[in-house]
């Protein structure tokens, strides 16, 4: 018996779709029957991904876009309406991480982090909200375990993800009145290129050596399957990876123990070159 595809005929809009979780989600939503809108800055990556998805039998629209630029996401949403006639799922995934001790960072570093990770999410929501109201669709916000637990040496990133978590908690009941399900995704360590993006948001070919044991890092394809399942079930939040779930559990039930673990891990984590 053929398995029913959970997003058959849906139009799925994904920011940050050129690599990592975003690209894996595009593949997984397409596997589940969706047509995908690939939104990111790197057009060559998007074109290659679109060709892969089209070859597998689904439609893919490429929209080069910078979530920090006013107007880009409105243009992307308009192109989606023209191509697919509707919008069923929106995934606000674009983001990067600013790292460093407080004394080594400036207010501009924090502003840059928020411009992508927070205001980029808001721009995505504003650009697509009316479309989601029409389809009673799904809004997916990419948070992080770092939105539950602050990590020394990553205060801009943690602050931005705490903000996304607050936005999701506020919007979930607010948008439920319009039939829109809001799902917050809180990943732990997932394989991605985030470590190849510097504090200015510029991608570099070589990433710093990873201080994280490989066993704690989930493949993007596995993470994407778990995320799509959570979106299909209209869950309020999904914490991804066993490590991430353990961290959130300890934060709620043994915060003192977790603080000790985080301090030890953060010291090791900050020894890497930048």
Regions found by a protein language model. Give the residues of each.
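Substrate-binding pocket helix/loop in short-chain dehydrogenase/reductase
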Residues: 101-102, 106-111
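Conserved glycine-rich cofactor-binding loop
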Residues: 18-19
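Residue(s) in the substrate-gating loop at a strand-loop-helix junction
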Residues: 144
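The beta1-alpha1 cofactor-binding region of Rossmann-like NAD(H)/NADP(H)-dependent oxidoreductases
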Residues: 64-75, 107
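Active-site helix of classical SDR
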Residues: 125, 160
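SDR active-site lid
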Residues: 177-242
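Conserved glycine-rich Rossmann-like NAD(P)H-binding loop of the short-chain dehydrogenase/reductase
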Residues: 32-49
């Amino acid at each position: 018996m053929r398995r029913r595809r959970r997003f058959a005929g849906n139009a799925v809009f994904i920011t940050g779709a050129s690599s990592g979780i975003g690209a894996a989600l595009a593949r997984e939503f397409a596997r589940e029957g969706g047509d995908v809108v690939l939104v990111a800055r790197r057009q060559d990556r998007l074109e290659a991904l679109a060709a892969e998805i089209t070859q597998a039998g689904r439609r893919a629209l490429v929209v080069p876009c910078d979530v920090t630029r006013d107007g880009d996401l409105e243009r992307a949403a308009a192109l989606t309406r023209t191509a697919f006639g509707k919008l069923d799922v929106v995934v606000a995934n674009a983001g990067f991480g600013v790292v460093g001790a407080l004394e080594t960072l400036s207010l501009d570093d924090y502003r840059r982090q928020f411009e992508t990770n927070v205001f980029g999410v808001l721009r995505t929501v504003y650009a697509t909200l009316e479309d989601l109201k029409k389809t009673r669709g799904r809004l997916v916000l990419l948070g992080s375990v770092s939105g539950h637990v602050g990590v020394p040496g990553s205060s801009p990133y943690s602050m931005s993800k705490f903000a996304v978590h607050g936005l999701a908690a506020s919007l979930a009941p607010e948008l439920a009145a319009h039939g829109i399900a809001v799902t917050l995704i809180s990943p732990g360590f997932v394989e991605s290129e985030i470590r190849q993006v510097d504090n200015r948001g510029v991608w570099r070919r070589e990433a710093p050596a990873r201080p994280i044991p490989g066993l704690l890092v989930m493949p993007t394809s596995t993470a994407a399957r778990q995320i799509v399942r959570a979106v299909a079930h209209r869950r309020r939040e999904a914490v991804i990876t066993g490590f991430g779930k353990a961290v959130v559990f300890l934060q709620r039930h043994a915060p003192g123990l977790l603080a000790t673990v985080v301090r030890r891990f953060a010291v090791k984590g900050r020894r890497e070159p930048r």
